[in-house]
Structure formats: C-alpha cells, structure tokens
Amino acid sequence: MAESRGRLYLWMCLAAALASFLMGFMVGWFIKPLKETTTSVRYHQSIRWKLVSEMKAENIKSFLRSFTKLPHLAGTEQNFLLAKKIQTQWKKFGLDSAKLVHYDVLLSYPNETNANYISIVDEHETEIFKTSYLEPPPDGYENVTNIVPPYNAFSAQGMPEGDLVYVNYARTEDFFKLEREMGINCTGKIVIARYGKIFRGNKVKNAMLAGAIGIILYSDPADYFAPEVQPYPKGWNLPGTAAQRGNVLNLNGAGDPLTPGYPAKEYTFRLDVEEGVGIPRIPVHPIGYNDAEILLRYLGGIAPPDKSWKGALNVSYSIGPGFTGSDSFRKVRMHVYNINKITRIYNVVGTIRGSVEPDRYVILGGHRDSWVFGAIDPTSGVAVLQEIARSFGKLMSKGWRPRRTIIFASWDAEEFGLLGSTEWAEENVKILQERSIAYINSDSSIEGNYTLRVDCTPLLYQLVYKLTKEIPSPDDGFESKSLYESWLEKDPSPENKNLPRINKLGSGSDFEAYFQRLGIASGRARYTKNKKTDKYSSYPVYHTIYETFELVEKFYDPTFKKQLSVAQLRGALVYELVDSKIIPFNIQDYAEALKNYAASIYNLSKKHDQQLTDHGVSFDSLFSAVKNFSEAASDFHKRLIQVDLNNPIAVRMMNDQLMLLERAFIDPLGLPGKLFYRHIIFAPSSHNKYAGESFPGIYDAIFDIENKANSRLAWKEVKKHISIAAFTIQAAAGTLKEVL
C-alpha cells in the first residue's frame, strides 16, 4: 500500500511539473515581448561601431597603391595574379572560404600586329593624316609593359571610307535633329561623336540605326576638361593625347554574348561569334581631342543648329557631310582590327557563414579588372572592399559571427559588359533568387570629391539615412558634422529639400543582374562631383592611362578620408542587413516612390492629352494598384512593429516577405526587346544604359509616339504596359498581406 501511494505521489508531482511547464510556455507564447531589449540594441550598435572604427584610411591607401602598380585588364595574366593576391588576403583576414570561380567568355582585344587608327586620305588614296596609336605614359610608368592602347572593345573589324558627319553626342535626339530638322542622312557616312551624356554603346547603336558605316568617339574639352585646372600630371584634367577606352556592346543584361542567360562554363552551348548578342556591326574607335580637332577643322556643310552642339575646341563644329573647300575631295578612313576571342576570367568569391540563418545571403561585390591602372575605376572600390573584408575578419577574430551569411565578390570582366558578375548570377540563379537579401555594389568609391552619391532601391532609403547620420563627414567645413548633414546641404532631393538626393538604379555596374534580372534589393554609394557647377562628364581621365595612384593621392582624396567614409557606409549597410533580427527594409518608402513614379509617367503622357482620349488610354488601373500597395504597405508596417522578436518563426515569416518584395516586381517575360531586364518599376533607359527609368515599359511605349507609323498600335502598346505595371504592383501588394 505504501509503495502504491509513493507511485501516486510521484505521478502527481510529474503532472504538476508538466502543467507548470505548459502554463509557462503558453504565457510566454501569448504574452509576447514586442521590442528588443535595450541591452541587445546597444550590443548590436556596439558591434557596428567596432566595425566602422576598425576601418582605416591608411589601409585603403596601401591597398590602392599595391593594386595599381600594374595594369590588370580582364583575361590577362596580371589580372589573374591580382585575383590570387586578393584570395590569399581574404584567407589571411579570416574569411571562412575564398575561392576562384572561372568562366570562358567572349572578350575583345586590339590586334597586336595591326594597330587601330583613323586617317584622312586624298584623291590618290594617300594617307595625309593619322591619329595617334598610343597614349604617352605618365611619369614613373615608362617601363610598364602590357598597356593596352586605346580601343573600343567588340568593335567590328573594317576599313570603311567615306564622308565625315559630326553628330554631337550621338543621342537619339541628336539623330532626330539631323534627320528630321536638318535633312542630313547619315547612311553610308562615317560619323564622329563626343563622349558624354549617354553610354557609348547607345551611341554606336544609334549610329547603326542611322545607317552609318563607322563611328569615331572622342572626349571634347567641353565635357572632360574642368576650367582653371591643368591636364594630368600637373592637374586632374584630360590631356589632349588621351583617349577613353570602353566596350560598345548593347547586351541589355545578357552577360557573355555567346551564352546569353546561361553561365559560360565548359559544358555550355555557345552561339557563333557573328551571332553574339549586342555586338556592333560597324567599326568604332576612340581618339584624343588633339586628333579630333584636326578631323573637325576641315568639316564643311551646315553650321551647328545651336550652342549645345558646340564643344570647346577651336573649330566651327560644322556638321558636314564631308570636308569643305579645297579639301572636299578628301575622305576619312577607319582602320580597326580588334580580335574577339573566348578567354578565361576569374571571380574571387569569399564567404563568412551566418550563425543563425546561414541560408540568407548579403552580397558585397565589385569588379577588379580595369582598362589600365584603374586607380579610380575600379580600384578605389577594390581597396574599399578589401578594407571592409579585413574589418569583418577582425570582428571574427574576437568571437563575433554574423546572423546571416556574407558573400564577398571580386568580379572579373566588368569592363567588357559586366561579365563576371552576370555569369556568377546565372550559374547560381536558383540559389540566389531563393536566399539573397541584398546586393551592395563596390565599384569606384570616388568619381569626384564633393559629396556623397547614393543609388538604391527605395527599400534602403531609411537605412542609408540612418547610417549616414552616424558616420562623420570627411568634407572640409563639416568637421563636427555627420556625413548625412554634408550630403543634405550639398545635394538635397529635388522632390523634398529636407532629405538628401537618392538616385534610381540604372546600369553600368555589377548590380545589374542582381537587381534588374533577379529582383534582389540593391544599392551603391560613392563620392561624386558637384553636379551644379562641374559640367564636365564623369571625371576627365576616365578609362585612360592617366588613372593612376598618384592621381588619387594628389588630387582626388589626399587624406583618403572620403574613401574611408564610403567604406564605412558600405560596410555598415552590409552589417545591418546581415545582423539585424528584422531585415531593415522600409516598405512605406517604396509605396511613396510608386506614387511619385506613377504621377510622373502620367504627367509625361498628358503631353498627348488628345490622343489619350482618342485611343481610350486610362491610368486609373495603375493609380488604383498603387493605392492598394500603399494600404498593404501600411498594414504590413503595423504588423511588423508588433512582431514577437523572440519567436523565430514569426521573425522568419516577416523577413521572407521583406526579402521577396523586390522579387515581386520581376516579370519573367522581361521588357520588350530586353529579356534580361525584368524589373517592371526600374530599368536602364533604352536611350542611356547608365540612367535609371521608372515604369520603363510605359516610358518606352510613349517615347516618340507621335512619329510612330501606326498610331493605333502604338497606343495599344501603351495600354498593354499600363496593364502589366498595374498587375505587377497589385501582385506585389498581395505578397505583403498577412500569411494565411
């Protein structure tokens, strides 16, 4: 009997203990803490402070000096050795892995036995003038070998000969002016255009559409020579002997021209070279403004239509076609012998594995290859990426590990069409679209030294504002102020003077495949020029032999503090995205941006008010979808601030909705004629790859619509793209609703 009572007592104790446990569990489940504790917030902030404090300007300077001693053109031995050097350093920094990943892509190089040049020939076919083959090397670099001469990668081979026509910047509107207002036909002509305003590949495409048989590109002092500044090496201006290199593809996001949509591996089917995507069918060649002045001096024909067609050379900028007076029998001949060949390239991919969510990735990537020394483009970004990786490694050595996985990437062959980054995205597409939270670009960290410039998805606006308020400004006169304060004062948003300007993402760098094709939230930050006063395009010595370490050290960032600020911002962005319990995206900013973009495209359409009425075109569905998205974003935000941060399932569900929102704006069918540009809200402009356009499908349908051959079909296309945009936004709103 005593034994039975003992067993009963034991079972009663166990039952009571179980009941107590269940009661505690239920209380803990239903009475949810809504906020992170003050201690956890302070710890999170302290780690970020340690990260940014670890970064040193002197280290960035040292990396930049080391990486710019030799040229590192994609596909060359020097660039492979630089990849190995970066890989070795990443391992030394303490990254969990650092691997070389190769692809075999189509690249383009000058012919080593036949030099490219432009000539003027007389009636006897005698060449009476030739442009320069090479740029004179800067002091201290006279003995450096393997410097590629100025050329335009992927130009067609050929020796076309004909009359010359000056076409200003070779923009769409420039050719419209020539053809529609001035009656000048470029068919069968060689055209000469100045660099600037738009991507060089768009210039070549426009020239081909106009019927030109070749195009010469040059950097006019009006666009690449700042007033009261000496040419390099005495100043940072462009010497007259320098010529801008660059590819002239029109890939529209395809990656390797021979394997569009698929990674360029050994097993991959390849198109024939003559079938390659976006490869020009006409010769293209760049020259310096000293040589351009000679070609332009002899032009006859019509005077320039207005001052916007005049540069700063001592010539009349007559349009042509052909030369004037006694020189009218002379022609221009191009000599272009570039060779396209399949070449192996190498990315370096490093990782720090996450401790809680290793299957969620934040990518920090930038390209390594350059046309010559590349001290600004890209190596100011390479040096910054290296210092960020070192600083994260330092945190690791002290016991810290991120919540999510960080992927560091040193891309190859960006200058040849964003090839390294695109091929890696294609190879890993199934993983990336399921697991990637964000892509932060680490291309050039400076393109000027006036103020910060940020281009990013609206999801990142608030995070950028927050972090720049906590980073000291490197600008003179702002010693006791934040980066945010100097940025706001120098470059306020045109829509809201109380906020600094943030630009839309276009293309022109390695974020393209991740944002435009895969819908991964992306952003980039660097220092830039004063756009109000500095009217020159880009920085003057862009893509020339004169882009040296000394250029940066003497003129652009002597203290390296501006590059340090960029490193701190890029690094802090990665840290917050990888280690915040809730992904720090703000969906309400996206809703506000959609309102502004919808109003903007509608106002553009109102220039054709009568046609809108005649063809029954309405934007009501678009505005309705934007309204629904705004309401869904507001409801989501209310739920987000109430989520139980101690419930990992609830946190994961909300984070998945945040992560996948950008993906919701992707149309798998792509934009018309641009299969790999799939983002319905943002895309590179069809007329300038560098610029971002909102509602690109609608914008392109409306562009020049008054000159379309079939007005009914043209407006029908507008209706179609309004419908696609409305559906996409409505569907995106659906992804924000509470999970059933």
Swiss-Prot record:
Its cofactor is Zn(2+). The chain crosses the membrane at residues 8-31. Substrate binds at R200, N247, E414, S507, G508, R524, A525, R526, Y542, H543, K689, Y690. Its main location: membrane. InterPro entries: PA_dom_sf, PA_domain, Peptidase_M28, Peptidase_M28B, TFR-like_dimer_dom, TFR-like_dimer_dom_sf. It catalyses: Release of an unsubstituted, C-terminal glutamyl residue, typically from Ac-Asp-Glu or folylpoly-gamma-glutamates. It comes from the Eukaryota. Coiled coil: none annotated. Inhibited by quisqualate. Binds 2 Zn(2+) ions per subunit. Required for NAALADase activity. The active site is at E414 (nucleophile), S618 (charge relay system), D656 (charge relay system), H679 (charge relay system). GO terms for biological process: carboxylic acid catabolic process; proteolysis. Residues 1-7 are cytoplasmic. Pfam families: PA, Peptidase_M28, TFR_dimer. One of its GO terms (cellular component) is plasma membrane. Highest expression in the testis. Also found in ovary and spleen. Weak expression in prostate, heart and placenta. In brain, expressed in striatum, parietal cortex and ventral striatum with lower levels in hippocampus, brain stem, putamen and superior colliculus. GO terms for molecular function: carboxypeptidase activity; dipeptidase activity; dipeptidyl-peptidase activity; metal ion binding; metallocarboxypeptidase activity; N-formylglutamate deformylase activity; serine-type peptidase activity. Zn(2+) 2 binds at D377, E415, H543. It is an enzyme of class 3 (hydrolase). Zn(2+) 1 binds at H367, D377, D443. Has N-acetylated-alpha-linked-acidic dipeptidase (NAALADase) activity. Also exhibits a dipeptidyl-peptidase IV type activity. Inactivates the peptide neurotransmitter N-acetylaspartylglutamate. Homodimer. Belongs to the peptidase M28 family. M28B subfamily. The NAALADase activity is found in the central region, the dipeptidyl peptidase IV type activity in the C-terminal. PANTHER family: N-ACETYLATED-ALPHA-LINKED ACIDIC DIPEPTIDASE (PTHR10404), N-ACETYLATED-ALPHA-LINKED ACIDIC DIPEPTIDASE 2 (PTHR10404:SF38). This is N-acetylated-alpha-linked acidic dipeptidase 2. It comes from Homo sapiens (Human).
